[in-house]
Design a protein with these regions (language model features):
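Cytosolic regulatory regions of ion transport systems
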Residues: 1-139
Length: 139
C-alpha cells in the first residue's frame, strides 16, 4: 500500500483519489473548496480543505510523509507550479502534475515535477481513436 496526496478535486482529482483508495491505497484528498472536500470525504482515507499554495498548509497536512503527491489544482500555470514547487521543497519523493498545455507541461517539468500528465488531451485522443473504429448510427 502506498500513500497519496491528491490536491485539487475537480473531475480528474476526484476520480483519481477515489480510484486509488478503491485499490487499497491511503489517500488524502485536498481542495480549496469545502463542498468538494465533503463530496469526496466518504470515498477516501482522509479529506481536508486548505490552500495548497501555502507551504504551511502542506506542512500541516504532513505532505512530506506521502509517497506521492498529485497536483490537479488550478487551471492556471501559476497555481499548479507553485504547489509543485512547494511539494518538492518539502521533500515529497514523487510529485505528479496535471498540465493543460505544452507550455504548462514544460513549466512543471522545469520546476521539478517527476511526471506530468495531460488527462484532457489523452481523453481527446482516445475519443478520436474510438470514433475512427466505431461508427455510430445517426438517428
Amino acid at each position: 500500500m502506498k500513500s497519496f496526496l491528491v490536491i485539487g478535486l475537480g473531475r480528474f482529482g476526484t476520480s483519481l483519489a477515489c480510484e486509488l483508495c478503491a485499490l487499497g491505497h491511503e489517500v488524502m484528498a485536498v481542495d480549496l473548496r469545502e463542498e468538494r472536500v465533503q463530496e469526496v470525504a466518504g470515498s477516501v482515507t482522509h479529506a481536508a480543505a486548505g490552500d495548497a499554495r501555502d507551504p504551511e498548509v502542506l506542512r500541516a497536512l504532513g505532505a512530506r510523509n506521502f509517497d506521492c503527491a498529485v497536483v490537479s489544482a488550478g487551471d492556471d500555470v501559476g497555481t499548479s507550479a507553485l504547489i509543485v514547487l512547494n511539494l518538492k521543497e518539502l521533500g515529497v519523493p514523487q510529485v505528479v502534475g496535471k498540465a493543460r498545455s505544452a507550455v504548462h507541461h514544460r513549466v512543471l517539468e522545469k520546476i521539478g515535477a517527476d511526471r506530468v500528465v495531460f488527462p484532457e488531451q489523452e481523453t481527446r485522443k482516445a475519443n478520436q481513436m474510438v470514433r475512427g473504429v466505431v461508427s455510430l448510427p445517426h438517428g
